[in-house]
Regions:
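Periplasmic c-type cytochrome electron-transfer domains
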Residues: 3-5, 14-363
């Protein structure tokens, strides 16, 4: 996969796109340099904690801005009273941390009683490729697909993540819990929680404005935040393989017929045209029975944003914590709202299952 640059306002979301390297966009180039830059302690890195020294350290597969391998997972923790609820956030618990590394299978193997915690959760590094197009999708398009009360009685709900930002309600669209509404918010949040770098206060609640080191705050200027935001915004989405094999076409038909497309919506409308992300950007619970995970306001334990499937073949392992090692494993890891879909997949012939995987690998 090659790094590409999109020209918003005249975007073609399939086919060849401009190359983003030296493509006549100085802000893109500055943003890329900052995304790629290893920061140092004298620049403010690492207070109160750091998971990496650069954005690219985690967002790297298969190109800069992509996903991260299992060993790059971060952890969160809290207390849910032994599974009886309610969920209680603990000091340090909402902060993504590499303090407790995952096992090679993505299982949470932590000592009990850390700060009173009895719930631990892994989070895998998501790709940011194509996030600029996702940011163009109107919130009303996302909320139009909600089915909070399962009106069609198919067992699949879908809830938009509503966030109160500076007194206003905004719809989240980025992050495993759809906890981030804008790319600039993602940049501010990651700078502080992943790198330990402070950014200017903007009233939206995602900036870390002060820390415990001796470096003057903010450690990242607003211009630098803007450059990184622009770089991410202009990264093109992964391009489909364009296979004309009949097996791929058959797999696409199966994807639709067994119900995968109910959540992994092939495209969502935007002012720039359809965005072929294969996600509805809604929260769903597809976790197994008795799953215990992190709860947030507006996103209960077990509820995660439907991840986009574009470029899915390059982002293994799968699910929020990377516990599915391949695409078949990811499908088989769907429960709860997706129970009927998983059962339908299990009842397919081997040939039909193989065709579905070929289709996914072509996205």
């Amino acid at each position: 996969m090659q790094l590409s640059h999109i020209a918003l306002g005249a975007v073609v979301v399939t086919g060849a796109l401009m190359q983003g390297q030296g493509g006549g966009d100085p802000q893109f180039d500055r943003g890329r340099a900052l995304f790629d830059k290893p920061f140092s302690l004298v620049e403010g890195l690492g207070a109160p904690e750091m998971n990496a020294d650069s954005c690219r350290s985690c967002h790297q597969d298969p190109v800069i801005g992509g996903a991260g391998a299992l060993e790059l997972n971060v952890s969160l923790f809290g207390n849910d009273n032994g599974g009886n609820g309610p969920f209680t956030s603990l000091p340090g618990g909402p902060t993504v941390s590499k303090m407790f590394p995952p096992s090679i299978h993505g299982r949470e193997e932590y000592p009990t009683g850390v700060n009173g915690a009895d719930v631990f959760e892994q989070r895998q590094t998501p790709s940011v490729l194509g996030n600029g197009l996702i940011g163009q999708i109107p919130s009303t398009v996302i909320t139009a697909n909600e089915d909070v009360n399962d009106a069609d009685q198919d067992g699949i709900f879908g809830i938009a993540r509503r966030l109160t930002i500076a007194g206003n309600i905004e719809v989240g669209r980025f992050g495993w819990k759809a906890q981030i509404p804008r790319i600039a918010d993602f940049v501010n949040d990651a700078m502080f929680n992943e790198l330990g770098l402070t950014t200017p206060e903007n009233g939206r609640g995602f900036s870390g404005i002060t820390d415990a080191d001796n470096v003057s705050d903010p450690e990242i200027t607003q211009a630098e935040v803007d450059d990184i935001t622009h770089f991410i915004t202009m990264l093109s989405p992964p391009q489909r393989g364009g296979s004309t094999a009949p097996e791929v076409a058959a797999g696409e038909a199966t994807f639709e017929s067994i119900g995968c497309a109910k959540c992994h919506t092939p495209s969502l409308a935007s002012p720039l045209g359809p965005v072929p992300l294969f996600s509805n950007l809604l929260l769903h619970n597809v976790m197994p029975p008795n799953f215990r995970g992190i709860a947030e306001p507006g996103a209960a334990s077990g509820f995660y944003r439907t991840p986009p499937l574009w470029g899915i073949k390059d982002t293994a392992p799968y699910m929020h914590d990377g516990h599915a090692e391949d695409l078949r494993g990811a499908i088989l890891a769907h429960f709860n709202e997706a129970e009927a879909v998983r059962i339908a997949y299990e009842q397919l012939s081997t040939t039909e299952q193989d065709a579905l995987i070929l289709f996914l690998e072509d996205l």
